[in-house]
Structure formats: structure tokens, C-alpha cells
Amino acid sequence: MIDLPITRRENWIRMLKHETPMWMPMYSDTCFIMPSHVPDNIARAMVVEAEPWPIEKVGGPDMFGIPWVYVPTVHGSMEDPDVPHLLEDVSEWREKVKFPDMDAWDWAGAAERNRDFLDRSRFTTTWFFSGMFERLISFMGFENAAMALIDDDCEDDLHALLDALADNCIEFTRRFKQWFDIDCLYFHDDWGSQRSPFFSVRVAREKLVPHLRRISDWCHANGMFFELHCCGMIEDLMPAMIEAGVDNWCGQSMNDKVGLFDKYGDRIAVGETLMWGPDNTKEEVYAKADRVIEHIRPVRHEKTMYFMEMVMNKDADAEALRDYIRSKTLGMYD
């Protein structure tokens, strides 16, 4: 690894503040913790902490008591299809949705066993499962959740529920800041399919943005950042993300990341996927890195982009790729 003039954490924060980084940031400059005392991390098979969590113990109820089942073929969980949905109509939420008592979770124990887990030279974060739309889906199924976003008759009930969910997320984040002193909340909410968004930008602005903005405002007021994990072909929803106060978005590769960088990179940091899978050659991966770097070079002081390097080729040298990107861009921002 080449010598760096500042820590990877400091460089990442420069990017998020739209200050000039010293080299092009990469996702490997970050690290995250998802401890097992949070029910959703077990339910969603996403425990990341000092001690590995046994795969046979994943699944089960999330923080709202919704049961999840682990599906080995997709390496992830889904709501238990044999259990009826909690809500048939969003107006039922006050009687049926039971919010978690987070003070009953063992925060002190989780902090103690993970005391040395986080690499403080990197940017630290935790994931929050699930975001507004995904949580609504877990309560009432996809079709009813989608209808709730556009049904004028339930608008007041929907906003009341989403406001309560925002309160819940803020309390979650407050405790993670207190016990783990993390830099960022990684908010998990998918808004689209491979071809298009699930809803319009108008719906996103009216129904989701006000509540996301409360969460991002809390993060910013408490020295944190707000990252949105949002899958799908959702280029049209970028204005809503910006209005929600999102600092960076790690979207999927079917989106034109370079085009979005050109259009919105002065207001949100866009993550460009750098995939090195079994079918990619080293030459292809390095050539893409070169193309992206040369594209951002002329506007590097005004707009922000980072690489999401996904190395899934057993013969690939991931660290050599990262050193190549650092050496090629170190000094580029001077």
C-alpha cells in the first residue's frame, strides 16, 4: 500500500463535504459494524461484528416482530411468506405496529465485544434496516405499500406512520453515535426495479422526502453523514435524494453514474461501480478506472465521485487495483 498524506477517513469526509479530496475515494476506505444485538441484523442475515455469527442462526423477528426467513440461494432474507401481513390498511398502524424498546437491547455488551473491531483510520458506518418504503412493505406487502404511497384517502395516516418511523430511526442512530461513535448512517431503502422506479419523483418528494430529511438533518446536526443505499434504475429520483439531504448514494450499475455525476455531482457524491467479477479481465477493469478518472479530472474541484470496487474474482489482486487508483489520482486534485 502506498503512503498516504492523510487518513482514508479524512479523505472520505473531504469528499462528502464537497471539499477537495487528496485522491479518488473508494468504498474500501470505509468500514461498517452491524452488531448482533440489533434484531434486524440477525433477521436480515447481515451481522458484521468481531465474532462471526452462525448462518444457521439468521432469520427470525426484526425489531417490529416481523418474521424473516433466510434464503440460501440468494444469500439474504425475505419476510416469511406463510405469515399474514401485519397491516391490511395503513390506518391500522396505531393499533398494530409495536415500536421496539431499544433500551432493552444490550448496547454496553455490544460495544464491549466490538471495542477494537472498527478501523478508526477509515470512515465508519452502520446500516439501518429498513428504510421507509421497505419497512412499509414488511408491514403490508409490496402491493399495499405501493398503493399507500398514492392513495389520497390514507395520506394523513401514512405521514403519521412515516413520522413515527423517522423518530425510531433517529433514536437508533442516536444510540449508535453514543456507543460506537460512528461517522455515518447507511440507510437501506430500495426504490426501483432493474428497469424503472417503483414510484414517481413527485411521490418521493411528497411522501418520503420530508421524513428522510428529518433523519439526515439529525445526522448533520450531530456530526454525522447520511448515505442512501437504494437499488434499482432510479435516475429520475435523484432530485428527491438531494432534497432529502443525502450525502452519497451507492446505486446499481444499470444507472448512468457518469451522467448523474455530470448533472448532480456538485450536490451529491455518486458511487461508480467498478466490478471485477469472474468474467472481467484485469485490462477491462483498469481501463474503466482510467476512463472514469479522466472524465472527472476537468471538474474534480466542483463535483464528487467515488469508486465502489466490487472484486469477486478469486484471481484478482484487489489491493493492487486500489493502489493503482490512489497512485493515479494522488495529486490530481491539487
Please report, for each region that a protein language model flagged, where it lies by residue.
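Active-site loop segments of alpha/beta catalytic cores
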Residues: 1-31, 98-334
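A gly/proline- and charged-residue-enriched helix-loop-helix capping module
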Residues: 74-116
